[in-house]
Amino acid sequence: NRPSFFQLRSTLSYNNRFIYEGGNPLLTPETNHDLQFTALYKWVQFGLNYQYRRNAIAFMTKEYEDNPDVVIFTTGNFKRMQYLTASAHLSPTVGIWKPELGIYFAQPFFKVTNQGSSKNMNRGSIYLFLQNSLQLPDEWILSLDADYQSEGNFGAMLQRSYWGIDAGIRKTFFNKRLTLGLQANDLWNSRYGSFMLFGPRLTYTKKANPDSR
């Protein structure tokens, strides 16, 4: 996989007096090796995947040459990065109720240098989602969905856990040619974008509350 033009950009943008963001014109392509297994039976599907990324392109930090007190958020090449993922997806139909349940587990195998020492970034994570659809008379459809992401490592980052619930109602008209709906996302405003980024000279923590509604 070749790096994108955005990743190769040579410009810098200013976040604050200690942090800049920019590209890396010295990036080289990465090579991916994937091994996948999928099994399907009626409304149940299982998957298993192993990925080996050689010369992997990933998010990182580095020192700003003109000022050692400033770090640059950028992308770089890492010798290798490995992932093992497993998934299960269930989608039965029970009368007017059509639920969908998804379970995903990701186990990374990766190391970074953080404040002078090697740090394992091997914390696995689980992602769950449950989607519920009720097919009511007169073409009314009610939906109630929930998802949960556990804490885990993604590259040089530790992603904090989050969860959320969405609800909606839809109705179709004119033999399903027109659909009108009302949707409410993230009812409890709980899908936070918090993470920790581990670099050679610093550990950066960000807690964000995006407008996911």
Q: Model-found features: residue ranges?
A:
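Transmembrane beta-strands of outer-membrane beta-barrel pores
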Residues: 1-2, 12, 41-43, 50-54, ...
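Outer-membrane beta-barrel signature, preferentially recognizing the C-terminal barrel domain
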Residues: 2-51, 73-84, 207-213
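Residues on the lipid-exposed face of transmembrane beta-strands in outer-membrane beta-barrel proteins
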Residues: 27, 35-41, 86-94, 103-105, ...
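Outer-membrane beta-barrel translocator domains and adjoining extracellular loop/strand segments
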Residues: 4-12, 18-21, 52, 56-65, ...
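Gram-negative outer-membrane beta-barrel transporters
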Residues: 52-54, 70, 76-147
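Outer-membrane beta-barrel proteins
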Residues: 23-29, 34-36, 72-78, 89, ...
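Residue-level detector of the transmembrane beta-barrel scaffold of outer-membrane proteins
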Residues: 1, 8, 36-38, 45-47, ...
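Conserved C-terminal beta-signal and adjacent last beta-strands/turns
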Residues: 123-213
